[in-house]
Regions:
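Catalytic phosphate/metal-binding cores of nucleic-acid and nucleotide-processing enzymes, i.e., regions
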Residues: 131
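Short beta-alpha junctions and helix-cap segments that line functional grooves
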Residues: 124-127
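N-terminal secretory signal peptides that target proteins for export/translocation
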Residues: 1-5
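A non-catalytic structural micro-motif
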Residues: 68-76, 91-122, 135-141
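Periplasmic peptidoglycan-binding/tethering modules of Gram-negative envelope proteins
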Residues: 6-70, 138
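Extracytoplasmic/secreted proteins, especially bacterial periplasmic and envelope-associated proteins
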Residues: 51-58, 84, 88, 92, ...
Length: 141
């Protein structure tokens, strides 16, 4: 019996480490049920990518369960483009995320949108990996 407990304990520790590292690398939380997660966009696009749908569905579930909170959807861009263009693109991204959530049954009155354009980068390096991290919409309680 002791060996089983030891194996089970090691398995849980390994699973936790793997999950934590993997989620951090992807910019996700370990437990999507207790946190709103950001979504990402392709270069110069505001349409919701199919690989971001699961994140939005998780966010919708959280918002439905916590309808006493209003959520701000913040649109962001990478540094390429003029500040004016990026403010408009960030706005389109935030509105696209809001529209998706409304289509999932979220009350539009619980959601507000704002664009920060390129002003609040997640990553400050001038390379494609950072640009991809900065093309996002964040959801704040």
């Amino acid at each position: 019996m002791t060996n089983r407990k030891a194996i089970w304990g090691v398995t849980l520790i390994a699973l936790f480490a793997f999950t934590t590292a993997g989620c951090a690398k992807m910019g996700m939380s370990k437990a999507s049920g207790d946190k709103l997660n950001k979504i990402h966009f392709d270069f110069d696009k505001s349409d919701i990518r199919s690989d971001q749908a699961k994140t939005l569905k998780g966010n919708a579930k959280w918002i439905k369960a916590n309808s006493n909170h209003k959520v701000s959807i913040q649109g962001h861009c990478d540094e390429r483009g003029t500040p004016e263009y990026n403010i408009a693109l960030g706005d389109r991204r935030a509105r696209a995320a809001k529209s998706y959530l409304v289509n999932l049954g979220i009350d539009a009155d619980l959601l507000k949108t704002v664009s920060y354009g390129e002003e609040k980068p997640d990553c400050k390096k001038a390379d494609e990996e950072c640009y991809a991290k900065n093309r996002r919409a964040e959801f704040k309680k």
